[in-house]
C-alpha cells in the first residue's frame, strides 16, 4: 500500500511540475534541460565553436540544449557535440552519439577516437549509477562515476576548459569535491532551481585545469 501511495504521489508531483510543463512546451525531452541551462547561464559556459562531450546523455535534453547553444546561421552546429549513454537515444540533429557503457574500456576507446585528439571545451555529465539503497555501496558507485568523468575531462579538456558533473550529497561527497579541487583551479557547487527540493543531487562545476 505504501508503495502504491508513493507512486501516486510521484505521478501527481510530476504532472504538476512546472518544469515538466515547460519542457513539453519547449520540446525538451526532459526537465533536466533547465538544470543545465541555469548552470550554463550562471557560469557563462558553452558558446559557438566549442567541442562538447555529453556523458549520460539519454534521453537527450542536455544534447538539445548544447545544440541550441552551438547553433550557427541556418541552425547548423558550429562546433561539435559528442554524446554517450548506455541507453539508446533518439537522434538530435548535429549530435554524434555512441551507445555503450562509459565504464567499458572499449567504449571509452571509441569515444576517444571520435574526439580525435581535438581539445574539448566542456564535458557535461548527468550520469548516475543504479542505486541499491545500501548507503556505502551507493556512495562508492557515485564516486566511481564522478571519478571516471573527471579522469576523462582531465585527459581531453583544453587548459581553460570546464567540467559539469552530477553528484549527490552524502558519504563520499567531500572526497569527490577534494578530487576535483586537486585537478582544477576553481570548483563550485550548483543546485539549480529545477532540482527537486527533496533531491540530494548537486552539480559540481570545475574550471581551468591545474598544470
Curated annotation (Swiss-Prot):
Its EC number is 2.1.1.166. It is found in: Cytoplasm. GO terms for cellular component: cytoplasm. Pfam families: FtsJ. Keywords: Cytoplasm, Methyltransferase, rRNA processing, S-adenosyl-L-methionine, Transferase. The keyword S-adenosyl-L-methionine applies. Its main location: cytoplasm. One of its GO terms (molecular function) is rRNA (uridine-2'-O-)-methyltransferase activity. Signal peptide: none annotated. This is Ribosomal RNA large subunit methyltransferase E. It comes from Bordetella petrii (strain ATCC BAA-461 / DSM 12804 / CCUG 43448). The lineage of its organism: Bacteria, Pseudomonadati, Pseudomonadota, Betaproteobacteria, Burkholderiales. The gene is rlmE.
